[in-house]
Regions:
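Catalytic pocket-lining loop regions of alpha/beta-barrel enzymes
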Residues: 265-266, 279-382
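Mid-to-C-terminal alpha-helical segments outside catalytic/metal-binding sites
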Residues: 157-168, 174-211, 375-380, 393-423
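Conserved, mostly hydrophobic/aromatic
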Residues: 166, 204, 231, 259, ...
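Active-site neighborhood of phospho(di)ester-bond hydrolases with catalytic His/Asp-centered motifs
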Residues: 162-165, 213-215, 242-243, 268, ...
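Active-site gating/metal-coordination segments in enzymes
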Residues: 210-211, 219-305, 309-312, 363
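Histidine-centered divalent metal-coordination motifs
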Residues: 166-172, 300, 334
């Protein structure tokens, strides 16, 4: 089998055990993306062309298309793709499994610039149901590529800037304890990474995320100062750190002023973890201060597995806040309310509140998610993943597949966040 040929070849790099074999077909970019559970753009497709040395292989991102003019300018010949029979003869791999590994000297392997957006990509491994996840540096080494070329188009337009407005990271000294506790009440969700600063930044960059918001939660009043200090430490153009507050913190209004002075981008509250009601009377002085300081607040909205029998932050309670503090910039996480889309429609759609998309892929049908987005307005929707709990690829792909226009996707993926945070 051709996959065994690749496996034997990759032994020299110690990578033979990293080959993934799928039960489903991965013969096309879309099929490979579904089988691997990644965005189609991260599939590294191998295209075969006639060349001076008998064959030129271009390894490009899944959303890229050959630019005939650029190809001719680079190689001095037209981009004529090989027939399936000729591709098999030259590479030893059938169409659907063509890959850049273990090529003879008369086959030139070139890597296209479209791949460099991603920390890791997935080329085939010789069969129509296989792949391997490699960094671009590994792909260059393992394929013995002759270099990088810029001979593709379309990808710059189809893969927009993405700002993830809902992610979490933890100091290394706390992450193990925190994740152990949270995993026990995660509704069966498994973290996609261990959310340290380094791992989260690496994961985001691997998925071509342009920036992400880090949302901390003070479950006890005593945690506010240290959490906000840590947020200030990691805050950057790439990590858009928010702060947090607890209503029982001594002089919480002064701490909100300090959050603003630290340059943090907003406040995160999680009523279930903090065991507070979002529309408790003592919260309104905090909301008014946030509005005064122009600090957006992200509220976990709807059901949460940490409190499965009592939902503290319902869409109706969020509406009380909207009505009482109209100057507050409020973000209702999880499309306004996990498992409460009927109440979201009743109380929140069309109101002065943003929704983020985190966990929508898990708790909403594609049709219901599109209905909510269109009813509320795409100018008030922010992309969010809830990393480390939500896989980025699945959530990006869901938004691309539900029927939104390119302009709507751009608004959700980055333009709304840029406007909201004045980036």
């Amino acid at each position: 089998m051709s996959v065994e040929r690749v496996r034997n070849y990759l032994k020299q790099f110690g990578a033979d055990g990293r080959i993934i074999e799928f039960e489903l077909s991965s013969a096309t970019v879309d099929l490979a993306a579904r089988a691997a559970g990644v965005d189609a753009a991260r599939i590294a497709k191998t295209l075969s062309f006639d060349g001076d040395s008998d064959c030129i292989l271009i390894v490009a991102a899944g959303d890229a298309r050959i630019d005939n003019a650029a190809f001719k300018a680079r190689f001095g010949r037209k981009a004529r793709m090989l027939t399936p029979e000729r591709a098999l003869e030259m590479t030893g791999y059938a169409v659907g499994g063509v890959c850049p590994f273990d090529m003879s000297d008369n086959v030139e392997v070139w890597l296209d610039e479209s791949l460099k957006r991603f920390g890791t990509v997935l080329p085939a491994c010789g069969s129509s149901n296989s792949a391997i996840e490699l960094s671009c540096e590994e792909l260059e080494t393992f394929s013995r590529a002759r270099g990088w070329v810029d001979v593709c188009k379309n990808w710059r337009e189809t893969y927009p800037c993405i700002i993830d407005m809902h992610a979490h990271l933890f100091p290394e000294m706390l992450v193990e304890h925190a994740m152990d506790r949270l995993t026990k009440v995660s509704d069966g969700l498994k973290p996609v990474i261990t959310p340290t600063y380094a791992e989260t930044v690496k994961y985001m960059k691997n998925h071509a995320i342009s920036a992400f918001a880090s949302l901390p939660i003070a479950t006890k009043p005593s945690q506010c100062t240290s959490i906000n200090n840590y947020a200030a430490k990691v805050n950057s153009d790439y990590v858009l750190a928010f702060g947090t507050i607890h209503p029982d913190f001594p002089e919480p209004l002064k701490e909100l002023e300090r959050v603003k002075e630290l340059g943090l981008h907003g406040i995160k509250l999680h009523p279930d973890h903090q065991q507070i009601l979002p529309d408790d009377e003592r919260m309104f002085s905090l909301y008014e201060k946030m509005a005064e300081l122009d600090l957006p607040v992200v509220l976990h909205a709807g059901w949460d597995p940490v409190s499965p029998d009592y939902t503290r932050c319902t869409p109706e309670r969020l509406r009380h806040i909207i009505d009482r503090v109209p100057g507050l910039t409020l973000i209702g996480a999880h499309m306004g309310g996990v498992k409460m889309s009927d109440d979201v429609m009743k109380y929140l759609v069309g109101q002065n509140v943003y929704f983020d998309t985190s966990m929508g892929y898990r708790y909403l049908t594609p049709e219901r998610m599109l209905e909510l987005i269109r009813a509320h307005g795409t100018d008030k929707i922010l992309f969010g993943s809830d990393c480390p709990w939500g896989p980025l690829d699945a959530q990006i792909q869901r938004l691309r597949e539900i029927g939104l226009s390119d302009d709507e996707l751009e608004m959700i993926f980055h333009k709304n966040a840029e406007k909201l945070l004045r980036l």
